[in-house]
Amino acid sequence: MKRLLFFIVLTLLFFNYCQSQCFTVGADMSYTNSVLDKGGIYRDSNGNITDPFTLFAQKGASMVRIRLWHTPENNIDKCGNPISTNNLDDVVLAFKRAKIQGMKLNMSIHYGDYFNDPSNQKMPKVWMGLSHGILLDSIYNYTYSVLKRLNTEGVTPDVVAIGNETTYGFIYENAPTDGWNWPKDADKYNIAFTAVDNFNKVNNTSIKKAVHFTDNTADWLAGLFYTKSVRNFDIIGISFYPYFSDFDSLQSLGNLITQLKTTYNKEIMIFETGAPWTNTAYADGYGNFMGNNGNFNYPITPQGQKDFLFDLANTVYNAGGIGILYWEPAWVSSGMCDLWGQGSSYENVSFFDFQNGNRPLPAFDIFNFCSTLSLRNQTIKDNILIFPNPASNEIKIIGLQHDVAIKITDVLGRIVINTFSKNNIVDISNIPVGGYTISLFIDNKIVSKKFIKI
């Protein structure tokens, strides 16, 4: 009996910890250091100049994503200078600025000297011509050494993405890629995963491993990866931009997330998204590359941008996703040069109004999504009871008006039951003793309750 009581106390402590966590809403701020270095200015709502990392944290952002390039100095920017943005020193600085504000850290390793994306997965210059075996050693050593440097600097990432939008290949000499090359591509992924695993073991860290796809290819690629034995990861990250998406509704995205989560038992997160708030004004002469919302009918206004983000967050949350990250909301115009221009080709998609001194736009409200979510779901949650609790053979869901889809997960997040309630009763006789979360899908909302199996 004492052992049972001790177990129940530990389980309740774990539940309290879980309940303190919430849906992640964060930002990719990879360019922010360089924007600041080149004179970029950010203001708060009162018009006071402010630090962007401080502002995002104060507004409620809970995670910062930063990309890492191997040797960006191999590229000459539009102003004629070697590019140093997003080298390892820059990543360390960005992570320090984010961590001191209490935000979690998400790193995207591109395994290239510049942007890698669906059309390009070019390896670092220093790896050109290596045999497959030596290339694998290089991938392992590079991945491990990056994590070691970050850990030494006190900014160990919470999530590491192995590759960025790897739609048609991974770490190739050619650009664009020639398509997948199995099993060699599996070797590349798996050696990088092994580097993270070994680092975690040696340093007692718990960095999560992610892959990163686009919305249009995520379903196909997840299946392909499993077929090719690329499975040792925790998170599937998805890029979803209305401008680039083939989808014509957010429900299509929600269906994708639910399918990926239930089929592969992985956490699903939107790693990149973005929507313009204007397409009629410009802060500089660097042409903007995103001027509309594709198949989605959100108006190109500050309120339209905000409405899209809240609808997106609701969709991802209701589908079982763990969060969304907005791509480069702090990329305002400055003297910064990249490979193609000077200034920003994205200021019309940022979270700052360049027509009003770079004051924050309404889109910043998305970082309070957890607060609005809690208020919205509390009434439904308060009306649902699990009885008995603790329970041994079955639980009854009190307060339901009809049968609903349910999912039960253990304390590690593993799905142990995925079914429909029958007469509001769920058979739990075949699951081990322990603490569990039951998630009920009620009227397009997810209501979660905790219970103990004895």
Model-derived features with residue positions:
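Boundary/entry segment of secreted carbohydrate-active catalytic domains
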Residues: Q21-P52
